[in-house]
Amino acid sequence: MSVAPIDFQQVEKRYDDKLVVDGLSFHVQPGECFGLLGPNGAGKTTALKMLLGITHPDAGSISLCGEPVPSRARHARRRVGVVPQFDNLDPDFTVRENLLVFARYFGLAAHEARALVPPLLEFAKLENKADAKVGELSGGMKRRLTLARALVNNPDVLVLDEPTTGLDPQARHLMWERLRSLLVRGKTILLTTHFMEEAERLCHRLCVIEEGRKIAEGAPRTLIESEIGCDVIEIYGPDPAQLREELAPFAERTEISGETLFCYVDDPEPVNARLKGRAGLRYLHRPANLEDVFLRLTGREMQD
């Protein structure tokens, strides 16, 4: 695709007197995985609904696969696969039947739909579950089936809303591996997620939104370096305020969340030296990550 598969320009959406999407702008490049991150109620799902033409924006412009939305949303969606936040598989059908029926929605002939099923089952690692009812599948299997179903029309763009919510770590990693294989095949992916590790592993770029506004955008590593830029020492124990006073001179920045003190350090040794052998304290020295960025930007439970 020569044009940006997804483009938002100064998009606004209001419900009654509440502005839930406020001048949101971003674009997604062909073959890119782009993440929308934000706390609950930030406007992520509303943005996806507007992208798909389900909800109409009050201002701004949206294009999907080169088509203006909402006026040409139905046409654009023929080149898009969608994985909703909650599975909407038909429980009365088998795994195979779910794929066959969905393929017919895109106008595929019966023989074309049947030819699609084996490679999709292989992709989802469900070859041995073709004749199983949906109710017999694990949560991870259902999510992979939903992803396979989103591929029946060979879409250019995939839109995924919280694709691994509710999955155990093993199922989540398998889903990530499947998504990475789609990127290798040149698919463009837009996803929302609450899992910072997921965003860091999958996304080439991401946009952090809060209260409908974009507050940061960039590659995960770039955001980590610009917003945090150092190592982190997490210290768990009583009286974090007293510890903060003691350790602040040896840190670039400190934050307290509950009973945890976060020390952001360029040189961890002075802080580590003062923590060794302390009774009643536990601490963890680690590289800065995307969760640190998210908490710093959104301010959730953190106080400077």
Curated annotation (Swiss-Prot):
The keyword Coiled coil does not apply. ATP binds at residues 38-45. One of its GO terms (molecular function) is ATP binding. It is found in: Cell inner membrane. Residues 6-236 form the ABC transporter domain. Keywords: ATP-binding, Cell inner membrane, Cell membrane, Membrane, Nodulation, Nucleotide-binding, Translocase, Transport. It comes from the Bacteria. One of its GO terms (cellular component) is plasma membrane. Its EC number is 7.6.2.-. It is a peripheral membrane protein. Part of the ABC transporter complex NodIJ involved in the export of the nodulation factors (Nod factors), the bacterial signal molecules that induce symbiosis and subsequent nodulation induction. Nod factors are LCO (lipo-chitin oligosaccharide), a modified beta-1,4-linked N-acetylglucosamine oligosaccharide. This subunit is responsible for energy coupling to the transport system. The complex is composed of two ATP-binding proteins (NodI) and two transmembrane proteins (NodJ). Belongs to the ABC transporter superfamily. Lipooligosaccharide exporter (TC 3.A.1.102) family. This is Nod factor export ATP-binding protein I. It comes from Burkholderia thailandensis (strain ATCC 700388 / DSM 13276 / CCUG 48851 / CIP 106301 / E264). The lineage of its organism: Bacteria, Pseudomonadati, Pseudomonadota, Betaproteobacteria, Burkholderiales.
